[in-house]
A protein has these predicted regions:
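N-terminal targeting and processing segments
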Residues: 1-38, 195, 205, 212-217, ...
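Intrinsically disordered, low-complexity proline/glycine-rich segments
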Residues: 1-161, 308, 315-317, 336-338, ...
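Short, well-ordered loop/turn elements at secondary-structure boundaries
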Residues: 18-20, 26, 61-63, 69, ...
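Residue-level detector of short, conserved catalytic/binding motifs and their immediate flanks
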Residues: 22, 65, 120, 198, ...
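Short aromatic-centered micro-motifs
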Residues: 23-25, 33, 67, 122, ...
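A general structural signal for short secondary-structure junctions and capping/turn motifs
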Residues: 57-58, 112-114, 192, 198-205, ...
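Intrinsically disordered, low-complexity segments enriched in small residues
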Residues: 131-208, 212-214
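Extended charged/polar low-complexity repeat regions
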Residues: 162, 188, 210, 216, ...
């Protein structure tokens, strides 16, 4: 078994050494670069061990201006190095005084001596230069790094204390991308039943995505009843211990430190920037969305999110009633979503006005225990939920009438799923838990074992064929190494912000990625040596993109929207948007244009091509396309089942019918008396095609 990556001193040291390893050698010896550190190694063979700690630290100061190695000026014979920081006799240690001489005493008084084992000299031409980029990064990140370290060290100790106190089970849940699930999903490491569903979406510069999430092992009351969370129940709660609890869009919680004005904190695991400015606390996520928490405080002590914005001025705004109950959302297109709640703050209905008509996007119903038992969509189609004691979900019946079931061992937050299945034995799993591993058997009698550490990260999977997949993570829970059952390895190296900078695939080929100071991807080098690059403006919008062939495409913006695109030949394409930020006209370099029209929900209803031909579209209340009229008069009609699967499609000539099975798998297709059927096993894997 491969244990998780060590978090101790040895593990950290190994990770640092690996990350520092260059990729360029001369005669099998590592090269030096401008900016690389040099450490004096005493000759222990001829001299006794030093009585004081060595301070003979140096740094390569210059390298070639025309030859780069690992992206920095390559240093060679006679290039100057910063040294001479061995100043006088070490002083007697005094309380409050530094134990080491400041690096500011470094001066360029040494030269690099080149030592190679074999081979002829390698000429490195060009006048000497410093590594300007590295120097800028040092000056730019020096103060920030010290501040993060100071805050981070202090804050990590606080997090450890909070976890020992068991502040909230939601703080122990991993991000979904880091979990391994099976069935209708169950988390392999914890036995947690985990369910998500997007109830509705609205387009816009910042789309409105109303998603709900359920965790069986976190009995927390909320705006969708116990154990359920929606994506806009975002808030921060001041803790007595000098920290904040942050409620994420998926309902999980993490901790953030209290800050002084002007301070910042970066949570690498969650990819969040936390800052305190004159307006208050602000959180910035990996997408660049900025969150402010000036909303009312809810009954659980959370200061609710008041706005979600982008750097170029788009914003979602939130309105609250007394007790921090969500009352409305104003979209980035200016639409008002009305949110109705009961006295406990539970959401009853979310609606929007569409061309003068109120459309109820989703409705919820609860039982006397505060559990959500029914959801009703825009087409008045329902899902039903049944729970056992402790708010444990035991049955879900979808819009098509099919049910999924869960059985547990234990009660409440300590319950773990031991059996899950769908009607007819679909997606059936039997689960057994051991110390540090989970054994599952599916309906096809295939067995799999998952091994995990204290952090609940899966580090080994033994599949039904005996094949072993191994994963190795770093201390930030980032996946660094995957070894598949055939023994091939995939590796990923990250920068200090947790962004991948080098990906080595199973064939040993590397992809390199570079970022700017705002964490924007600026270049990508493919295994074949091709380079793609991007440039950005102050709002982090792409203003140019250069292809491997050297062609550059440029983008210009006006008022937050894309206005022109200029291709590699200098041809300009002009885009025009309406006041709701829908693209309504595209003008080509030759003067021709295409036009689009939309309804009140932002759905395309008419498209006009460069010849003036018109195509028209119509939708149902759930945004399913039900009618398409082509320029020649041919009309396509579409019908759907309660799950949103297309069951009937026709035009002026043809007609096709479809039937579906569990989870929307296609069971049959019929056209012009030709009937094709599809058969699946209990894992919904295709096994048979008949006609």
């Amino acid at each position: 078994a491969m244990p998780p990556a060590a978090d101790g001193v040895a593990g950290v040291a190994c990770n640092i050494l690996k990350s520092m390893a260059p990729s360029v050698k001369v005669h099998n010896q590592w090269i030096a670069q401008a900016g690389i550190g040099i450490v004096h190694l005493p000759a222990f063979v001829l001299h006794p061990a030093p009585l004081v700690s060595g301070m003979s630290e140096s740094e390569m100061w210059m390298g070639s201006s025309t030859v780069l190695a690992d992206g920095a000026p390559c240093s060679s014979l006679t290039h100057p190095a910063l040294s001479c920081n061995i100043v006088g006799i070490p002083t007697i240690p005094r309380k409050g005084k530094p134990r080491k001489v400041s690096k500011a005493l470094l001066a360029p008084t040494s030269m690099l001596s080149t030592i190679t084992s074999v081979g002829n000299p390698v000429l490195v031409g060009g006048p000497p230069t410093i590594d300007v980029f590295a120097l800028a990064m040092k000056f730019g990140l020096k103060g920030l790094g010290k501040m993060w370290k100071k805050i981070g060290d202090r804050f990590q100790n606080l997090i450890d204390r909070l976890r020992k106190k068991g502040m909230n089970r939601l703080a122990d849940i991993l991000q979904p991308i880091k979990c391994k699930t099976f069935g209708e999903p169950v988390d392999a490491a914890t036995g947690r039943v985990y369910h998500t569903n997007v109830d509705f979406e609205l387009p816009g510069p910042i789309p409105v995505v109303w998603e709900r999430t359920y965790y069986s092992d976190a009995a927390v009351d909320g705006p969708l009843g116990y154990n359920w969370h929606h994506s806009y129940n975002l808030g921060i709660r001041q803790l007595e211990e000098g920290a904040f609890a942050f409620r994420h869009a998926d309902g999980r919680e993490s901790f953030l430190p209290t800050l002084k004005l002007g301070e910042s904190h970066f949570d690498r695991k969650e990819q969040l920037f936390w800052t305190l400015d004159a307006q208050g606390y602000q959180l910035t996520d990996i997408r660049g969305l900025q969150y402010r928490f000036d909303g009312r405080e809810n009954r659980f002590g959370y200061r609710m999110v008041s706005g979600i914005s982008t750097k170029d001025g788009f914003r979602l705004r939130f309105e609250y009633a007394s007790g921090g109950r969500l009352a409305g959302i104003i979209s980035s297109r200016g639409e008002f979503l009305k949110v109705e709640t009961d006295e406990s703050g539970r959401v009853l209905c979310v609606s929007v006005n569409q061309d003068g008509e109120e459309v109820k996007l989703v409705r919820y119903r609860y039982d006397d225990r505060g559990d959500m038992v029914e959801t009703i969509d825009a087409l008045d189609v329902s899902k039903h939920f049944v729970y056992s004691g402790g708010h444990l979900l035991v049955r879900l019946t979808n819009q098509g009438g099919m049910s999924f079931h869960w059985e547990y061992e234990g009660k409440g937050e300590n319950a773990r799923c031991v059996h899950t299945w769908g009607d007819g034995g679909v997606m059936e799993y039997f689960i057994r838990y051991g110390k540090g591993y989970t054994h599952i058997r599916n309906g096809e009698n295939a067995e799999t074992e998952y091994y995990y550490g204290e952090d609940k990260l899966i580090y080994k999977i033994v599949d039904a064929n005996g094949g072993i997949t191994r994963h190795q993570y770093n201390s930030f829970q980032e996946l660094e190494v995957t070894v598949n059952p055939e023994g091939y390895t995939r590796k990923t190296a990250y920068n200090e912000f947790g962004q991948p900078i080098r990906i080595t695939d199973e064939n040993g080929e590397d992809t390199f990625l570079d970022y700017d100071g705002n964490r924007n991807l600026v270049s990508l080098y493919t295994p074949g040596g091709k380079r793609l690059s991007w440039d950005y403006d102050r709002q982090d919008r792409v203003v140019s993109r250069t292809t491997p062939g050297g062609e550059t495409v440029k983008y210009a913006y006006d008022g937050g929207v894309l206005r022109t695109i200029t291709d590699g030949q200098g041809r300009v394409y002009t885009l025009t948007f309406n006041d709701r930020y829908d693209l309504e006209l595209l003008q080509f370099p030759n003067g021709l244009f295409r036009r689009w029209e939309y309804d009140g929900r932002g759905r395309l209803v008419q498209a006009v091509d460069v010849k003036g031909n018109v195509t028209r579209y119509a939708y149902d209340r759930a945004d399913n396309l039900v009618r398409l009229e082509e320029p020649d008069g041919n009309v396509h009609r579409f019908e759907y089942d309660a799950m949103g699967n297309m069951v009937h499609a026709s035009d002026n000539i043809r007609e096709v019918r479809f039937t579906y099975g569990a989870l929307g798998v296609l069971k049959s297709r019929e056209q012009e008396r030709h009937h094709i059927t599809f058969g699946y096993n209990s894992e919904l894997q295709l096994r048979r095609i008949g006609n």
